[in-house]
Amino acid sequence: MDMGGLDNLIANTAYLQARKTDSDSRELQRRRRSLALPGPQGCAELRQSLSPHFHSLCEQQPIGRRLFRDFLATVPKYSQAVAFLEDVQNWELAEEGPAKTSTLQQLAATCARDPGPQSFLSQDLATKCRAASTDEERKTLVEQAKAETMSFLQEQPFQDFLASPFYDRFLQWKLFEMQPVSDKYFTEFRVLGKGGFGEVCAVQVRNTGKMYACKKLDKKRLKKKGGEKMALLEKEILEKVNSPFIVSLAYAFESKTHLCLVMSLMNGGDLKFHIYNVGTRGLAMSRVIFYTAQMTCGVLHLHGLGIVYRDLKPENVLLDDLGNCRLSDLGLAVEVQDDKPITQRAGTNGYMAPEILMDKASYSYPVDWFAMGCSIYEMVAGRTPFKDFKEKVSKEDLKERTMKDEVAFHHENFTEETKDICRLFLAKKPEQRLGSREKADDPRKHPFFQTVNFPRLEAGLVEPPFVPDPSVVYAKDVDEIDDFSEVRGVEFDDKDKQFFQRFSTGAVPVAWQEEIIETGLFEELNDPNRPSGDGKGDSSKSGVCLLL
């Protein structure tokens, strides 16, 4: 009997079954019935320690945003402001056409009304709206009205929210969020892959059913290879990033043997797999454009935070269940300090820009756009620009080609727009590269993206051209993933233990709150008719101890 094949079948079956788990499963229901929010009396200290900022509390944090909206709905003047903002957002995200133009005119008419004592808009704005004669003028004024409304909400409505029971409830959720996290918080499933310091496996949060990928970094291996600084940098960068186009960090914790990063689980496999292992080599142009648009948004989000990715390639671009893609593996990402160039060589051969390959490397953000050009080329042609499929090339020869050869387009699927964007991204000199030619050089304006509505894409309203098969595990068989040998002769001192504690910060607020809302736990624990905990003990006690 093929025991390896049997092990793989068992691992895949358990993993696929876990992915199908929903809130109706008996075990999950039993666990959730035992949960309770911490009592309000435990929030006094937290209230004093927090300095609430409108943007963080009411816009970035999903539970804060939800409770702020619930509060605003209780005050007529405030709810009118919210309704206006929703109308503006619907207009912004609408497809171009007569309906969008009509909505703009209706919004401008709303702004033109005389503001009464209950209005959140100014008299000056109303006067300008009445005088507006073109849609371009109306567009500018509606954007101004949006800004005025946001400013209004940040003043008295925000202060009223902080004094309301809705903010008290937010503090209870923050206490719940701050509970300790350990490996007991999760159920672990099959190994999905491995890296230099450990393996990646699928895990499931026991109390919500949410599936994640857990990157387990072997503590001894980290110390032996001197990888602590790199691991902490990746963790801190992931914490800063909140983008639908980059994998999210949800938890950081330690077990006895590992440091663990719990991140978005991308079930659809990586783009390299789809380029080379599904059908004919390469991808359909509709997919190339869609993925490139999402990858471009991800790179722009990183650059906006002062981060250079340095490892953009199809292998690091992962698909989710719906077919949307995200950038992953930020292990080589680096923050730019005071606009100073980076001098350390890092990246993957075949995707590194010429300025990285020079004897004295000195580079910055443009290297990511060069890698974007390599990735577009590979998605279309099923090979990289400077190395043919399965061609054996030395590192030195590949370096020489990258620095000197002009890119050639022999594959029949290259359109003129695709050739042009590849040439611009693959420019040898960074100052001539698309995305870097001037401060406001925006790759999204290139004709290659003429069919992409970027505001709708960022809002998740564009349907992906390909949806992964939910019954397929897009990962190597478990017996093909090599086990790590045990690291011997490594002992930990107090400095190591301090580092492990610094790394293990628990739940990441935005991702954790999204999980709580997405899995229905927010509604369950907020239900005033819900029995307290499991019906045993004092319901006012903290629910933290019940969660683990």
Curated annotation (Swiss-Prot):
Amino acids binding ATP: 192-200, 215
Lipidation (S-geranylgeranyl cysteine): 545
Residues the record marks as active site: 311
Matches recorded under InterPro entries: AGC-kinase_C, GPCR_kinase, Kinase-like_dom_sf, Prot_kinase_dom, Protein_kinase_ATP_BS, RGS, RGS_sf, RGS_subdomain_2
Main subcellular location of this protein, as a coarse class: membrane
Processing and modification events after translation: Autophosphorylated. Phosphorylation at Ser-34 is regulated by light and activated by cAMP.
Pfam family, one: RGS
Biological process terms in GO annotation: regulation of signal transduction; signal transduction; visual perception
EC id: 2.7.11.14
Keyword Nucleotide-binding: yes
Residue ranges of coiled coil: none
RGS domain location: 54-171
Subunit structure: Interacts (when prenylated) with PDE6D; this promotes release from membranes.
Function according to Swiss-Prot or TrEMBL: Retina-specific kinase involved in the shutoff of the photoresponse and adaptation to changing light conditions via cone opsin phosphorylation, including rhodopsin (RHO).
PANTHER family, A to Z: G PROTEIN-COUPLED RECEPTOR KINASE/RIBOSOMAL PROTEIN S6 KINASE, RHODOPSIN KINASE GRK7
Protein family membership: Belongs to the protein kinase superfamily. AGC Ser/Thr protein kinase family. GPRK subfamily.
Note: Although the protein is present in a diversity of vertebrates ranging from bony fish to mammals, the mouse and rat orthologous proteins do not exist.
Protein name: Rhodopsin kinase GRK7
